Amino acid sequence: MVGVVVEHRRIDHPWQSHRWQAVDVLPGEVSAADWTVLGQGEGWVRYLAGAAELSLFPGECETYAYNLQSREPAIYVVLRKTDDARGIKLLGATVDPGEAHAHADTGDDLVEALPLPGPVREWMEAFVAVHYVERTKWKRKRDRADPEAMAIRTPGQRGYEDADYEDED
């Protein structure tokens, strides 16, 4: 479980008046209510958007290991645009780069990569140590092509079917 901190900032843009951005994740349970104001300044407000449950699955260990081995391991926060007064909601958080990429591909979700907090990293490392089995990579080889497979057959050759033709004279 992590708490997600988002920021609402006014921007000078011809088509948008503001921007939402995930700025921090707080490891562990959060005691404050969703959308509690954490801080504000001129043109910006930070909220605790809510809590997000992190789940790990043994079948996805390869992507978790990839995330942990990257130069900057990340946790991905997914925000979704809505039609309500706030205009955005917390959809969740993930440590799976593939899942984050899938959300980014939809076009409706805002995905932010944030630094992976230490306790979450340790939890992931322990999970990967238990469940990760490195798969051997092998290159698939094609069957050798039979150059005679499409050849024209003559009588007496293997594969030639002798048909009885009768002349109609």
Give the predicted meaning of each segment:
Residues 1-116, 133-169:
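Terminal targeting/leader modules
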Residues 120-132:
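Amphipathic alpha-helical interface segments used for dimerization/assembly
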